[in-house]
């Protein structure tokens, strides 16, 4: 009797241990399966802000809304203000992402040079800038020399560059604008002038509206803001298209940077990874008029030097 009881007890103990072992292994497999098949959004939460480049803003706006739809516990606030403002704010820690059309080293110099060293660059796209005019100026192409003369005030009438007998109205951007820096560096090769009768406006949407509604107006915009209310001007006979930018034929372009102060983690890292995902790069980037960095056949360094890949 005692022997039978001992056998039954031992058998029950063995079954119990086996069951425990089976449950442990099953849980591990389930957890591994969940981490590989469940969406990454399951554990993502947090809130952060991005500010800066208005040229990049349409892409960040659209991507952030899609990301928040996928991750209900994440809140992202996106503002403009210009590249200079975005870089200053992320360096100061008032926002978590500083959007910029220029390298941080270009804007944060001299006394702020150490701040630039703390920032981590995430290049999410390429933006191209085109000179744009009111549709009735009678010109569809300008040379580099003509653009320089217009934006430095040497030429003030469209007839002097082959257009109508009409006063040229400049719509420029503030000095802090990354769009202005890109246009000056790669279209003009010189600084534009803040002339007394010119208009200065940082918001790209407002620039487009002003150019479309002001007779004789000229300005410049990222391709993502082009529409049929304005005219995009050819540069030295070359159109600002994604193909011409990618090949290096059209020179007025820059990387779109999303800077963080140090390496990102948590929801911030997840969002930046999402910006570089096929979902955003393969659809939103192209649909909004940007060029994926991977499509570029040339590269450009912080000094502006272009080399073939």
PLM regions and their residue ranges:
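C-terminal motif of bacterial Sec signal peptides marking the signal peptidase cleavage site
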Residues: 15-19
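Bacterial Sec-dependent N-terminal signal peptides
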Residues: 1-8
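A composition-driven surface/loop motif
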Residues: 11-13
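Exported/periplasmic ABC-transporter solute-binding proteins
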Residues: 4, 21-77, 81-110, 116-309
